[in-house]
């Protein structure tokens, strides 16, 4: 009962989760948003490209103008209020790029280890401090950290969870494009 009461406090903590649809942390974030009834969306590469082929159609995401993962990452960081990176240090590959993009777009970012549940109160405080309504969630793909999807799912469920009777129905994102910055001009 104690954990159910605790999770109810987090109801409405963020209005929307965005992510890029890659295996691992990205899909964990989208799955948790769907499960908890939190609005979700984000950008995926053109053609819905991902390491396992294509991003499943169940995730309603906008396709970036290119198939480049870096362009998708930049758009998701740009369109968020802040980025939560769920990863063990040191950051590598696309996860390191996400941190660079957060710095470039001057968006708050926070790196958390998904196995350290004690960080949840700190993350809640950080979300409130920065008045985060649209949260970009990023981290390693499954092939880089085999258990990262499961760990991220558990972490995000504890962070954003709510009692079943307070569960909202997620608004499915529309396919309508928001403004797309000329991603070809972005320098990484």
Predicted regions and their residues:
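Acidic/glycine-enriched connector segments
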Residues: 10-134, 141-144, 148-163
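Non-Sec secretion/translocation targeting segments of pathogen effectors
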Residues: 185-188
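A short, basic/flexible loop-to-alpha-helix module at the beginning of a structural domain
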Residues: 2, 6
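Low-complexity, Pro/Thr/Ser/Gly/Ala-rich linker/spacer regions in secreted
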Residues: 164-168
